[in-house]
């Protein structure tokens, strides 16, 4: 039987195609925005950090309210905020007003997350991990298309702002489509069911688990967000690539992330434990970053762009969220809010740190990301070991119960 929420899911996914473009719009148009705002690269980086603050300011609040009042209002609000950002950012001529519009874009991201992730888990209860990972496919598609769009605009000597207008146009059409779609019922007003008490207790999240998943939300977001913002500049100024070639690194990066999504989604659904992939991908990210820092040559950077896209931006953040949401079966919006609040702290703090590092050396930025990835691997290892320990405990408990 066809899932009645498939059209809704498709619309939700298209929002993240636009979001993928929105994340990179300012960094890929950095030179033009420096002129528009009368600032330098560090100034643009500070404006980029406003997305993280805006996201953090409302994410937990929006997640809690989406559990209570439903997902649709927050998704529509997020789309409206994003369109305001796309139009408004081009109308300002200083970084203060630009910072306000960046803050609005961060809020838009939070509203979308608070409504979309729980909606997909409720629309596809048998495969929530796959449903969430596919979000990353659309984010990566947007990040793949944007460098091509900007390269075309540069080649045709057209206004850089058309890249913002294209994103706004897609979002507007999708808003009209989603307005007519049906959303799955949310659990906010359901009465508690006594027979679910045992299951709820089994899924209760300990303080240690809560802290580890929340910290992983920060680390995983920081690892790939830093690369997505500075990969082009690293290729140009450290590896000695041309501007047009350095921009294409982001397309290579997104090809890697797309391939990872299409490989990971069936693996999680059928054979491999999510925690295994969490540990594996985080470890490979660390090795890739360490290698490119030691050997920042033309071909190494190209290979690095593909590998780091595969391992850090191919759905590992969504895997972490799905694992955490399993600990909050009746409060998925709350889990999303907590997890992505940590991630939004990363999108706020990382640009501030890298703005300082960029004034010294762009190479230092990748060394900094290498250290983050190393911590991420240790954390993923901790999560994986605790998860397997709990799985063995529950299996033993089930085997002993019939004989009790």
Curated annotation (Swiss-Prot):
The chain crosses the membrane at residues 6-26, 44-64, 85-105, 133-153, 158-178, 207-227, 247-267, 274-294, 297-317, 337-357, 365-385. Residues 1-5, 65-84, 154-157, 228-246, 295-296, 358-364 are periplasmic. One of its GO terms (molecular function) is transmembrane transporter activity. It is found in: Cell inner membrane. Residues 27-43, 106-132, 179-206, 268-273, 318-336, 386-404 are cytoplasmic. Gene3D superfamilies: MFS general substrate transporter like domains. PROSITE patterns: MFS, SUGAR_TRANSPORT_1. Its main location: membrane. GO terms for cellular component: membrane; plasma membrane. It is a multi-pass membrane protein. Pfam families: MFS_1 (PF07690). Signal peptide: none annotated. InterPro entries: MFS (IPR011701), MFS_dom (IPR020846), MFS_trans_sf (IPR036259), MFS_Transporter (IPR051788), Sugar_transporter_CS (IPR005829). Keywords: Cell inner membrane, Cell membrane, Membrane, Transmembrane, Transmembrane helix, Transport. Belongs to the major facilitator superfamily. PANTHER family: BYPASS OF STOP CODON PROTEIN 6. This is Inner membrane transport protein YdiM. It comes from Escherichia coli (strain K12). The gene is ydiM.
